Amino acid sequence: MIRRLQYLYHMQLNFELPVREHHFKLRCFPSTDARQKVFNERIEIYPVHFSSTEKDSFGNTCVYGTAKQTHDHFSVDVQGEADIDIDRQLKDEEYKVGIFKYETPLTKAGTSIRKFHLELEPAVLYPNNFERAFYIMNMIYDDFSYVQGVTGISTDAEEAFNLRRGVCQDYAHILLALCRLERIPCRYVAGMIPGEGATHAWTEIYDNGVWRMLDPTHNRECDDTYIKISSGRDAKDCSINQGVFYGGGKQTQEIKVKVSVI
């Protein structure tokens, strides 16, 4: 059964002082793959002088552009629809996924995570990567609490694990850190789920030639209500907005997301 979802994404940067010659890279656009088909997508960027669309090294859709004129805010609005079919799995060749076996600065396992890993049941008890990752996810969920405001975008897995508190990015980074200790290929996913709020983060586990999705924040396998925006080794690879400009002073960012079932 295919589920159709409608999505709205809004991001706005507000600058304390005017900026100019703003060169940006945006990564906030769902792409069509085996599992999801995106259509009726509309994109509005303000201000913009020039833009082009390309794929990054992980296959994520990116828009590169320039806003030359002076401005005190910068915004992007994306809306569209997506058909999700969880029976169609995202396949990948094994030789392509090796990069996702290894830690990154944000998913590096320190003393606490390694100690936690030693206390887990032996991996031999689980028949495949997915079942093993599912067990690890359960153990994280029992030992971690969802709390906003105690971590930030630069918080790594070890720091969040020591706090035993954090948000979806932290849950995902901790699961990736533990799976990579066992050389299970796994990656970070940024996307959207039903309701109103911000973007969400979860993981993909490589198992027998396909990527299967786990949401450690909600302790479950992802269903047909998840819209994928991007994936990579960690949250840094899925950064929504990157840019350089002249001027600006302090800046604040607003993100609003709405996903509904049609």
Residue ranges and their predicted role:
Residues I84-I86, K96-G166, I174-L178, A235, ...:
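Secondary-structure boundary elements
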Residues H71-D77, Y206-E221, G247-I262:
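Short flexible/disordered coil segments
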Residues M1-I84:
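Intrinsically disordered, low-complexity N-terminal segments that are enriched in acidic
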Residues P47-S52, G98-E103, E221-K228:
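Short, surface-exposed linear segments at secondary-structure transitions and domain or protein termini
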Residues I2, L26-I43, N219-C238, G248, ...:
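Glycine-rich, small/acidic residue-mixed loop/short-helix segments
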Residues Q89-K91:
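Domain-scale recognition of soluble eukaryotic interaction modules
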Residues D170-F245:
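Hydrophobic/aromatic-rich core segments of domains that either
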Residues T61, I84-I86, R220-D224:
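A short local loop/turn or secondary-structure capping micro-motif enriched for an aromatic residue
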